Amino acid sequence: MKKLSFLLALLMTASLCRAQEELPVLSADRPGNTWGAEVLAFQKVSWENGFNFESAPDGTHSLTLNSTIVRYGIFKNMELRVGTDFMLLNNGRTPEHSLAVGPLTIGTKLKVYESTNWLPSIGLLAEFKSPHIGSKEQLPSHIAPSMYALFEHSITDWFGVSYNAGLVWDGETATPQTFLALALGFSITERLGTFIETYNYLHPDGNQYMTEFGLTWMVTRRLQLDLECDLDFQQFGKYYAIGGGVAWMIN
């Protein structure tokens, strides 16, 4: 599961920001698969960690024990990102599980425009997966880049919209997948929020249409907890993923 930024955090912490305007508030890159345009504040460090259980139609399943991303604000409008996954895999035919480490992912996000009136905030995200660092069976044959345009609207103080468009290479072929995502975020209270999103991978060999929904709890301005569930309505009842996690702005 990809780790995502979500404008829901901004909605839920708007009053906190007004009360403490000099203090930055965490805008987490999880949960969800739709990134927002916000970046981490200058010289701030965040650690985001989650778990995820995924069951596929072919009987295989995986448990992501630790899906980690570390973010660092290198400039006012730019952040550096490093992440990987630690997983238990099962082929669905035997009870044995194997431990695997996903490829190291390195990237950067740039905020290029701050929302004005009905115009959205705009960001750019570029990442690549290393073919050298991680478990051998999880590594791509070549560097696997991805790039995204990120858009984010705060419609009201309790409702927001994020949407993305991007290209994703798998490191095996020269033909990328097209990534399209749309997320709706709602503030239930000042600290509790919910979201629903659709995220889709389009490829000549076949498309994948996914839906995710979940809850977020902004414990403090620097700490967020979340729960989420993914469904594939093309294979309803055969595929699902459930997970949760924490995002923490360390300094």
Spans of features found by a protein language model:
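Sec/Tat signal peptide C-region and signal peptidase I cleavage site
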Residues: 15-19
